[in-house]
Amino acid sequence: IYKEIIIPDLEFAVEWLDKGNDATTTQPTKKAALGMLAKVCLQTKEYATDEYIPEALDAAKKLITDCESGGSTYGAYMYPTYEEVFAEKNNKENKEALWKHRWYAGSDGHGSSNGNFKLNRNDEKFLCNINKFGAREDNQTSRLTWEGSQAGIFMPTQYLLNLYVQQDGTLDPRFHKSFTTQWNANRNYEWDESSKNNFGKEDAIVGKKLNTGDLAIKIVMPQDADYAAEVSKKVTANYLIVDYKDVYDDANKNVITERGAGENMFRYFYPSLNKHNSSNYYVANASKKRNGNLNATFIIRMAEIYLIAAEADIYLNGGANAMGYINKVRQRAGATLLTGSASVRTVLDERGRELCGEYCRFYDLKRTGMFKDNSYLQATHPDLARYFKPEYALRPISTTFTNGINNGAEYQNPGY
């Protein structure tokens, strides 16, 4: 399907699509097609062939050259700083996005609120359950703010968070720009006996109060400058201090689910990816908290192209230029530049740091052979490795379809 349909279609698109501009949304442009061509050609590596890797590198280099020379041919661009990429003011006309998509909702376009709020729902997926602490509550007012209040379903693994620890022991600057680690109270709150016990506070905390707007929750990493000071007052402070070590077990590379004889309540609080946060909503039904996120989601952006070039260079040239591509991304982020030769794992780790939460990881691990057995997961996420089967590298055709026809087995993904 790559050879006969996907790649020829993208080559045709590169030739015939318009250049577009930064305001172009949903409709693909020439740079979108070229970026996807680079990505798709690289993905064919999972089939143990280098046939399309030269085309992947060539497409990536065209965009890189254009980006570094002003973008006159394709409009390629990379923001000078990492935080500009996900600043909400840059969302609608994001210069770095090679392709982005926005949904529309409004009273002129929908007569019912039954489904018109189901737009870009990425903002609903990554927030930890801050409402497990009484100074926070899930309400409509908070849902419309950038920090939000709806608990998500995606929690960073121990492995992911430790990718942000640099060789000198400091945190990669992208960590605190990508993850929210503290929240203010959105209601008045008074500590009670139950909360004291749940969070290991001293007896004197009972009766102490937090007012709306006060610091309520603070997650601290061992690499933070104020880590020791914050941990030293964990049982006395009138706000909730969550130590990384209360949530993650570095030795076992997993999440700590039990504390003493009971549940570990700290596990509900973890660094929460904020790339998809929004304060731009269409309110379909306020009483039911049905709000449609009007922000765009980025399908592919320029920083990824440098990492595609790095990986393709490893396959074709032994990585002679790979570290240079990787360090372009790191330099923009303000991270420590890497030295030595780059391996595929070097690229994978950098993709984890730069592209976390941008829905690339499954394809990255599949492409690089990390799903051939459970060894990669055993080293990075052993709790998950116990349940892994090689067939999980394949996407199944839904049984809703296959069970509804007499010859459904013929349509299942071969090998699943």
Where are these regions (language model features)?
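Long, intrinsically disordered, low-complexity segments
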Residues: I5, V85-L160, R267-I299, M323-Q331, ...
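An aromatic- and glycine-enriched ligand-binding surface/loop that stacks and positions planar moieties
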Residues: Y2, E11, L34, K39-L240
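Surface-exposed patches in mature extracellular/periplasmic domains of secreted proteins
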Residues: K19-T26, S72-Y79, L337-G340
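C-terminal substrate/ligand-recognition segments
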Residues: P173-N327
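Residue-level detector of alpha-helical recognition elements and their boundaries
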Residues: N21, A48, G71, E190, ...
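Extended, hydrophobic/aromatic-rich amphipathic alpha-helical segments that build helical scaffolds
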Residues: I1-D18, T24-I64, W99, F175-K177, ...
